[in-house]
């Protein structure tokens, strides 16, 4: 089976690269999308979610927050604000972040509800991906 090269990049540089990927699945703003070798060139906006990476020896999950994906025939580039593999996620830190975000959402005087909603979505996403180890 043909494979693609996957590169996940954050503002800090490349954080994940794999050459033998059979299938990459991610959540775009239009819905879930899967990519295999030979896919037509595409650019899509990503929402906070996970990237599922299938390769011959297994599957890995990477939590990502906002960005976009560029798909070429044999290369997928994911450009996001943050990215963590399931094994890199500090579950306790993610739980604390979720609690803080929930607290801010409950505070009716909080003027930055949208920021708290985004923080909550990121924390919950990290916890979901951490469970996929």
From Swiss-Prot:
Domain of life where this protein originates: Bacteria
Record keywords, A-Z: ATP synthesis, Cell membrane, CF(1), Hydrogen ion transport, Ion transport, Membrane, Transport
GO molecular function list: ATP binding; proton-transporting ATP synthase activity, rotational mechanism
Regions that span the bilayer: none
Subcellular location: Cell membrane
InterPro entries: ATP_F1_dsu/esu_C_sf, ATP_synth_F1_dsu/esu, ATP_synth_F1_dsu/esu_N, ATP_synth_F1_esu_C, ATPsynth_dsu/esu_N
Predominant location: membrane
Topological category with respect to the lipid bilayer: Peripheral membrane protein
Record Gene3D superfamilies: ATP synthase delta/epsilon subunit, C-terminal domain, F0F1 ATP synthase delta/epsilon subunit, N-terminal
CC per GO annotation: plasma membrane; proton-transporting ATP synthase complex
Keyword Protein biosynthesis: no
Family: Belongs to the ATPase epsilon chain family.
Subunit structure: F-type ATPases have 2 components, CF(1) - the catalytic core - and CF(0) - the membrane proton channel. CF(1) has five subunits: alpha(3), beta(3), gamma(1), delta(1), epsilon(1). CF(0) has three main subunits: a, b and c.
Known role: Produces ATP from ADP in the presence of a proton gradient across the membrane.
Name assigned to this protein: ATP synthase epsilon chain
UniProt lineage: Bacteria, Bacillati, Bacillota, Bacilli, Bacillales
């Amino acid at each position: 089976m043909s494979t693609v090269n996957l590169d996940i990049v954050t503002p800090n540089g490349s954080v994940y690269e794999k050459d033998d990927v059979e299938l990459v699945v991610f959540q775009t703003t239009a819905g879930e999308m899967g990519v295999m070798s030979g896919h037509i060139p595409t650019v899509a906006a990503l929402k906070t979610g996970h990237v599922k990476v299938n390769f011959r020896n297994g599957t890995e999950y990477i939590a990502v927050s906002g960005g976009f994906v560029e798909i070429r025939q044999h290369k997928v580039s994911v450009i996001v604000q943050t990215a963590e593999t399931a094994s890199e996620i500090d579950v306790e830190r993610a739980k604390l972040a979720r609690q803080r975000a929930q607290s801010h959402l409950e505070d009716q005087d909080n003027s930055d509800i949208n920021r708290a909603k985004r923080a909550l979505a990121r924390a919950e996403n990290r916890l979901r991906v951490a469970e996929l180890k």
